[in-house]
Amino acid sequence: MLEGAKFNVLAVGNHHNNDNNYYAFTQEFYQKLNEGSNMSMESMQTSNAGGSVSMSVDNSSVGSSDALIGHPGLKPVRHYSLSVGQSVFRPGRVTHALNDDALAQALMDTRYPTEGLTNYDEWTIDLRKLNMGPAFAQGAFGKLYKGTYNGEDVAIKILERPENSPEKAQFMEQQFQQEVSMLANLKHPNIVRFIGACRKPMVWCIVTEYAKGGSVRQFLTRRQNRAVPLKLAVKQALDVARGMAYVHGRNFIHRDLKSDNLLISADKSIKIADFGVARIEVQTEGMTPETGTYRWMAPEMIQHRAYNQKVDVYSFGIVLWELITGLLPFQNMTAVQAAFAVVNRGVRPTVPNDCLPVLSDIMTRCWDANPEVRPCFVEVVKLLEAAETEIMTTARKARFRCCLSQPMTID
């Protein structure tokens, strides 16, 4: 069994405080998986431009620790006995189409104060400056909306407080605190930019930049699963690797790195998103078959064994394969079948025969079953930079040969 790494603000493996309540359940679920369960695992496919509300499997949120959950900069929450449906009375500014949207109205309800973050006052959203547009993704506990804040396009994530379950509400509050604390302290060109957050009695709200290009998975789907041009694929892979090198350098783990959570900016650069709250559904509802995350998940996470930052490296290997091939990983399997094949038969995606050797080497090292064999992201960045140089050099040589083959002309 692997020993979880010791991080300043992160507990890993089976030591998550939030894992204890459902550990037995997940073990039973894995037992069924190990017996060859053929449950449907189709993803919700709710990729978005500011995060994701798709569900995943082993997802105590990024940076989970008592120190982070109990951060002194986070206000205690007052509890109200109202539901979202009961709260809507005097809305703030929403589009006409959202008049019947209870979550949006609950956020804008002026009868209740906006609760922000002490010591993080600059991150507390001023709802007077927030204009909400249509929802573009949703899950069991919330929705994602496009909107504007101070005139800037933003993605607005709203999570609903469970009405009749204090335990679920407490857990979701912890997840909200963790994601806000993470995003407020992560500043990198390849990390989705955090704009602010707030609470209302019935909802939590997180606002991030809006990535107009959608997710990498949506991009590949629009291309009808055709491979991304190699130069662009390597550039985007480098964006992800650099962002993750930064995240790991801050002693955090993402835990749900996949193409759904990689957002494309207007300049085609990649932004890593989804650092916590979007993955609350599994722990609040128990292990669920409605997830596609198994396709990217490291075997030690699938088996609920102790893990460390190398789970993100494994997932990156799968993402790199996606960019190179344009295909959905294990597309001929359900996600549960893929998980079974990965863990019990060592199956991995097939590397194309014409794949650049350096890229093939990166993929296979990243998704090695042994986490100790997987490179760190700092090394991955160096390897991809070498691949990028090789691709550019080859292209220049090809252009030079083309020029030599053309007859000389005199003007």
UniProtKB/Swiss-Prot annotation:
<keyword id="KW-0723">Serine/threonine-protein kinase</keyword>
<dbReference type="InterPro" id="IPR050167">
    <property type="entry name" value="Ser_Thr_protein_kinase"/>
</dbReference>
<comment type="function">
    <text>Serine/threonine protein kinase that phosphorylates proteins on serine, threonine and tyrosine residues.</text>
</comment>
<keyword id="KW-0418">Kinase</keyword>
<dbReference type="Pfam" id="PF07714">
    <property type="entry name" value="PK_Tyr_Ser-Thr"/>
</dbReference>
<dbReference type="GO" id="GO:0106310">
    <property type="term" value="F:protein serine kinase activity"/>
</dbReference>
<keyword id="KW-0829">Tyrosine-protein kinase</keyword>
<keyword id="KW-0597">Phosphoprotein</keyword>
<keyword id="KW-0808">Transferase</keyword>
<feature type="binding site">
    <location>
        <position position="157"/>
    </location>
    <ligand>
        <name>ATP</name>
    </ligand>
</feature>
<dbReference type="GO" id="GO:0004674">
    <property type="term" value="F:protein serine/threonine kinase activity"/>
</dbReference>
<feature type="active site" description="Proton acceptor">
    <location>
        <position position="256"/>
    </location>
</feature>
<dbReference type="InterPro" id="IPR011009">
    <property type="entry name" value="Kinase-like_dom_sf"/>
</dbReference>
<keyword id="KW-0067">ATP-binding</keyword>
<comment type="similarity">
    <text>Belongs to the protein kinase superfamily. Ser/Thr protein kinase family.</text>
</comment>
<dbReference type="GO" id="GO:0005524">
    <property type="term" value="F:ATP binding"/>
</dbReference>
<dbReference type="InterPro" id="IPR001245">
    <property type="entry name" value="Ser-Thr/Tyr_kinase_cat_dom"/>
</dbReference>
<feature type="binding site">
    <location>
        <begin position="136"/>
        <end position="144"/>
    </location>
    <ligand>
        <name>ATP</name>
    </ligand>
</feature>
<dbReference type="GO" id="GO:0004713">
    <property type="term" value="F:protein tyrosine kinase activity"/>
</dbReference>
<feature type="domain" description="Protein kinase">
    <location>
        <begin position="130"/>
        <end position="392"/>
    </location>
</feature>
<keyword id="KW-0547">Nucleotide-binding</keyword>
<dbReference type="InterPro" id="IPR008271">
    <property type="entry name" value="Ser/Thr_kinase_AS"/>
</dbReference>
<dbReference type="GO" id="GO:0004712">
    <property type="term" value="F:protein serine/threonine/tyrosine kinase activity"/>
</dbReference>
<dbReference type="GO" id="GO:0045995">
    <property type="term" value="P:regulation of embryonic development"/>
</dbReference>
<protein>
    <recommendedName>
        <fullName>Serine/threonine-protein kinase STY13</fullName>
        <ecNumber>2.7.11.1</ecNumber>
    </recommendedName>
</protein>
<dbReference type="InterPro" id="IPR000719">
    <property type="entry name" value="Prot_kinase_dom"/>
</dbReference>
<dbReference type="GO" id="GO:0010344">
    <property type="term" value="P:seed oilbody biogenesis"/>
</dbReference>
<feature type="modified residue" description="Phosphothreonine">
    <location>
        <position position="288"/>
    </location>
</feature>
<dbReference type="GO" id="GO:0006468">
    <property type="term" value="P:protein phosphorylation"/>
</dbReference>
